[in-house]
Amino acid sequence: MAMNDPDRLRRRSPAILAGTVPSYSERLSHEPRWALAEASAFFEGKSKVQDTLRRITGRLDEMGIPYAVSGGLALFVHGYRRFTEDVDLLVTPEGLRAIHEKLEGLGYVAPFKGSRNLKDTESGIKVEFLVTGQFPGDGKPKPVAFPDPAGVAVEKDGIKYLGLPTLVELKLASGMTNPGRLRDLADVMELIRALHLSKEFGRQLAPFVRDKFLELWRMQEESGFTDNGDK
């Protein structure tokens, strides 16, 4: 094969580029004025994070790969607005393989060899993948697993997100089983507060997480939360 074969060069490019893509997270840490401007843009829907989201979901739609946005961007679209510095996507194992085969080296690089995640070479933002059939939190088998995105996604402005019940279930299961993921339980509490979720909302959740939802709901009630809405 010729040394200048374009396909060969393309396949080598992720390893070459991985160390040269500026890190969005590092820039946030080291450039406070830029970080403040970026945070302001985020809450207007105009940040590099949202640009990265639109870019990757547009590519997945073009390739026909099912996905659902999770993490902080899903929280944002459902009504709890907090800043996030990465893009989290739920995909199937087949979808993940296709993503790496078709996108790695073409605007995206792996942060390190063998990583299932990618970094957008334009923004430096990490795109993290959750995979259908795997388990949230400690990663061990449990009654709540990452579902097929095609069955749980809701669309807003042309982008598919985890539906609210699924988002809450996964965050509860994560926070319940991994002490390092207590932020997920805090996110659920903020959703309860921001959306005025009723305790009846818990009925549509998996039994494995239902009691934890009710516990968090009661904590909000005791701290002054009032149940004045049915979501």
Model-predicted segments: where are they?
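Compositionally biased terminal segments of proteins
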Residues: A2-K231
